[in-house]
Amino acid sequence: MAENQQAAGNENQNQPQFALQRIYVKDLSFESPNSPLVFQEQWKPQVNLDLNTSHNKISDNQYEVVLSLTVTAKVGEKVAYIVEIQQGGVFMISGIEGPQLGQMLGAYCPTILFPYAREAIDGIVNKGSFPALMLAPVNFDAIYAQALKRKQEEAAGEAKEEQTH
């Protein structure tokens, strides 16, 4: 009976495991360079969202994933505000390697972090006396797939160049 429990324990160690250990704001910045004059403008902002993800290995099964967002809102040619946030998370991932690990770190973890970053951005924008900013959901799986395809195309292009030289 103890042998069965030990065998079951060994099987569980080889099973893919994922756990969120911590979510935190790593960096947050808000600028409103044209306040208070921008409040007199008719509020029809052009909102631009730039995003980036990065990750690093902390220990054997621990990874830090950082989602960086920059939101720029302009009214006409005037910048109403700029918000920059780095939303971080520590994730325990084991039993997952190769392309699956890349997908977890490049798409799944940022998908978990995004609502926290969106909430922090909305809160700081509101404290700046601007209307609520509801950022639309982001399809990190599609972004990750596009980035992977672009890397593969670049690698294929470099391989072709090496063959022609």
Curated annotation (Swiss-Prot):
Family: Belongs to the SecB family.
Any matching Pfam family: SecB
This protein's UniProt keywords: Chaperone, Cytoplasm, Protein transport, Translocation, Transport
Cellular component terms (Gene Ontology): cytoplasm
The protein's name in its UniProt record: Protein-export protein SecB
PANTHER family: PROTEIN-EXPORT PROTEIN SECB, PTHR36918
UniProt entry tagged with the keyword Metal-binding: no
Species whose genome carries this gene: Marinobacter nauticus (strain ATCC 700491 / DSM 11845 / VT8)
HAMAP family: SecB (MF_00821)
Record carries keyword Amino-acid biosynthesis: no
Location in or out of the cell: Cytoplasm
GO molecular function (one): unfolded protein binding
Subunit structure: Homotetramer, a dimer of dimers. One homotetramer interacts with 1 SecA dimer.
